[in-house]
Amino acid sequence: MVGVTRTAITVRRGAGHAELVLLTAAAAWAWVVLRRGDTGSGAMAWELPAFLGMWTVMMAAMMLPATAPVAALYARTVPVHRTPRMTAFTAGYVLVWSAAGLPAYALATGAAHIAATHPAAGTAAAAAVFAVNGVYQLSPLKDRCLTKCRSPIGLLLRYASYRGPSRHLRAGAHHGAFCLGCCWSLMLLFMAFGVMNPWAMVGLAAVVTAEKRLPRGPLVARAVGLASLALALAVFWAPLLAPNLTGGGMTGMTRAYA
């Protein structure tokens, strides 16, 4: 009876840690919604520090809901001080996605320049973006990374061997690296749809969560890959499918170049 009670307490504590991560994601979404009013005006040109801050909050909003169960499970492997150590794990995870903002900035700047100066080339660039995502979504490397994100038990066993004051940060960063490997091509679609495009954020966040949490997540990944390949062809006939590259609905950084 005592064992059952302890198990129930552990489960409840794990659920509480998941809720903490979800609350963080909700706060990030609230920031994005409020900030959207500023970025949509076209008066603001993103500098790198501002872009990295915005990108980090975006990634927290989009990626943490799918990662909350893993963070909570990690907290349950820690005997004491679970909340601060889970916070360090989550921070390490977000740090990886924050670092991904550096190439994202270069790509977003390039997309803005293409849309403003070479609209015809923008359609070809959009087709390339959709094609890259489609091919990667169907690749063995995507499957491998997605498997690690969906079934992290092996990773958690590895993290148990980590030592030192930074072990929890390292564990989160390691898990974040696998998730980056799983989802980087989806984030590439922001080049086509526009950074800070709220509908793109919601759609891509839904895809990420479905891939990682639904029983048929790998099937979702393949379906998205096939749809992306179809968009790579369709964008030549319907350029507005990629508004950020074809100038049909410029948002965020692209507007700064208009």
Language model feature labels by segment:
Residues 17-21, 47-51, 85, 89, ...:
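Residue-level signature of transmembrane alpha-helical entry/exit and packing/kink sites
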Residues 64, 130-143, 209-213:
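Transmembrane alpha-helical segments that form the membrane-embedded catalytic/substrate-channel core
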Residues 82-110, 182-216, 226-228:
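A small-residue-rich subset of transmembrane alpha-helices
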Residues 143-187:
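A mid-sequence, solvent-exposed acidic-amphipathic segment
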Residues 1-57, 80, 112-121, 140-162, ...:
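Histidine-/acidic- and/or cysteine-rich, low-complexity loops and terminal segments associated
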Residues 18, 22-25, 123-130, 134, ...:
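Residues within membrane-spanning alpha-helices of integral membrane proteins
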Residues 117-125, 217-226:
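Membrane-interfacial entry segments at the cytosolic side of transmembrane helices
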Residues 3, 7-11, 50-94:
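Juxtamembrane transmembrane-helix termini in multi-pass membrane transport proteins
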